[in-house]
């Protein structure tokens, strides 16, 4: 494969991981990074793989879905995990890094690899066929390239995350929540409903108004689409605005009383098996501690809520992956282009790196004339792939970015003792499925990354 050059656009976690995996497999790579010619407002370091927000790659415990993803990436020779392990700082069971040393380590690995050529310039056009390219430009993709991508994908490009919190099903108090679709439509159990009387509703609105908000970054303009306003912004427009908006009770009478509550919080099934539920319309800029406090204290039925994901809104460029991408992460309308990282709708540093690894393996399969072999669905990598293809979500799901969570995994079979038992079963099954997948694909399975010299 050495005479074939693949272009990778973007030097973040997804792009550097994709470039590394391709180069280690013998493919010549041109890695295009716009720094220092142009910087997004979020970037300050000179090197590749800059961690913009947190320095944490989250839990390293495999009983956590992201920790299991760490383990799988290490087994596949991940550049990002290798450099993170070398530059880690004490953080309990989390994998946190010295972000400057981490960026330097990734940059050194790639600049030191004979198969990688790094070009510092901004691209305003997508590479033409037939040469293959991986687009990994991240959540702050430059405007010109974003416009070309929107044209290529038929306009299916989103510019803001509208992420609502997700609650574990087992932590919802079913003595308070009731199953009902508005006006009785659907199967009847598509939604759970949390009823609020007038006093409860007013107390909740007041808590929203007083709650601590995340300060907008300088590169995030505080302007919102009317279709995805933060709940606290709606609350600022008037006391009853939410009760006439996402919390409207019309058609949601409580079957136990036969009466319509003053307001209703709807929870929508997040996965096919109903293990996680999305708080409908609850995109928010409340800080994560405030979300936990306010939603548990003021929403009936969520006093003991376990949050699988917390809400947020921020600038993000991502495609509607299940409709735009083929299973091998290539663009359906332009098969020579592969997407990787947050632009596909994965959320998080580690998930971005994992997506870069999957895209690289897909490119290798394409170059070898093989059909793409996706990771086994019960692995953490496979769960992310299920998210990207839509297999992890019910029909009609409104595609939004997601971290890797156990709710994306296929359901377990048999009985398992409590939450810990279910997590252990997920991990055991994932490990069993990953090993034969690696063994069956030696041309695309790479050796572990060498230590930095």
Curated annotation (Swiss-Prot):
Obligatory cofactor(s): FAD
The reaction(s) this protein catalyses: uridine(54) in tRNA + (6R)-5,10-methylene-5,6,7,8-tetrahydrofolate + NADH + H(+) = 5-methyluridine(54) in tRNA + (6S)-5,6,7,8-tetrahydrofolate + NAD(+); uridine(54) in tRNA + (6R)-5,10-methylene-5,6,7,8-tetrahydrofolate + NADPH + H(+) = 5-methyluridine(54) in tRNA + (6S)-5,6,7,8-tetrahydrofolate + NADP(+)
Span list, region Disordered: 433-453
A biological-process GO annotation: tRNA wobble uridine modification
GO molecular function, one term: flavin adenine dinucleotide binding
Location, primary (coarse class): cytoplasm
Pfam family of the protein (one): GIDA
EC supergroup of this enzyme: transferase
Location within or outside the cell: Cytoplasm
EC code: 2.1.1.74
Binding site for FAD: 10-15
Gene Ontology CC terms: cytosol
Ranges of biased composition (kind: Low complexity): 441-453
Keywords from the named record: Cytoplasm, FAD, Flavoprotein, Methyltransferase, NAD, NADP, Transferase, tRNA processing
Function according to Swiss-Prot or TrEMBL: Catalyzes the folate-dependent formation of 5-methyl-uridine at position 54 (M-5-U54) in all tRNAs.
NCBIfam families: gid_trmFO (TIGR00137), PRK05335.1 (NF003739)
Family listed: Belongs to the MnmG family. TrmFO subfamily.
Protein name: Methylenetetrahydrofolate--tRNA-(uracil-5-)-methyltransferase TrmFO
Name of the coding gene: trmFO
